[in-house]
């Protein structure tokens, strides 16, 4: 009897656990598409990344990485499936990081990229903060990824606001 009760209890607890949704595989890395991207340029991209809370507070991307990800079939897949449809994707092919330009946002969520090649990019960062819940003072992470698609021409100096 005790073994049956224990087994029933374990099964009940296991059924309460939430499972993460399965990750969606990505397309094959389009190496030729990436190899054809310009490696250097003269444009400047600067801007600010933030989110507003429901209460109207502004939360900055202070200290977070900001990336310029060239628009390709591979990054478009990420944009459509992950950013728009909120579907979990497997980790990207590590070769993609050779083509992404990175910087760090300052304390006001401002960022700047120099010597950017002409092309289309996703400017992407994370803006997150913790807020109290109704569960004994526990904190919950809020916010998330923000991204904006931009077009950069040679010699441009453009200002971008990245938010929802």
Language-model-derived ranges and their functions:
Residues 6-9:
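Sec-dependent N-terminal signal peptides
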Residues 45, 101-103, 123:
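Structural detector for hydrophobic anchor residues on beta-strands
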Residues 1-4:
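Positively charged n-region of N-terminal signal peptides that target proteins for export
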Residues 119-133:
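A short, solvent-exposed beta-strand micro-motif common in secreted/extracellular proteins
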Residues 108-115:
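Short, surface-exposed beta-strand/beta-hairpin micro-motifs centered on an aromatic residue
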Residues 79-80, 84-108:
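Short, acidic Ser/Thr/Gly-rich low-complexity loop/linker segments typical of extracellular
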Residues 12-15:
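C-terminal motif of bacterial Sec signal peptides marking the signal peptidase cleavage site
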Residues 17-85, 130-164:
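Primarily secretory-pathway and cell-envelope proteins
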């Amino acid at each position: 009897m005790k073994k049956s009760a224990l087994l029933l209890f374990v099964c009940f607890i296991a059924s309460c656990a939430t499972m993460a949704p399965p990750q969606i595989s990505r397309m094959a890395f389009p190496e030729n598409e990436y190899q054809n991207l310009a490696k250097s340029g003269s444009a400047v991209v600067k801007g600010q990344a933030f989110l507003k809370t429901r209460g109207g507070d502004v939360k900055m991307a202070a200290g977070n990485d900001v990336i310029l990800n060239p628009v390709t079939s591979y990054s478009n897949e990420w944009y459509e499936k992950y950013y728009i449809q909120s579907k979990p994707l497997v980790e990207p092919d590590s070769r993609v990081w050779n083509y992404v330009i990175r910087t760090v946002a300052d304390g006001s969520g401002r960022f700047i990229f120099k010597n950017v090649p002409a092309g289309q990019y996703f400017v992407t960062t994370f803006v997150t903060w913790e807020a109290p819940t109704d569960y004994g003072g526990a904190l919950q992470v809020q916010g998330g990824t923000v991204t904006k698609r931009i077009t950069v021409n040679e010699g441009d100096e453009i200002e971008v606001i990245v938010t929802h």
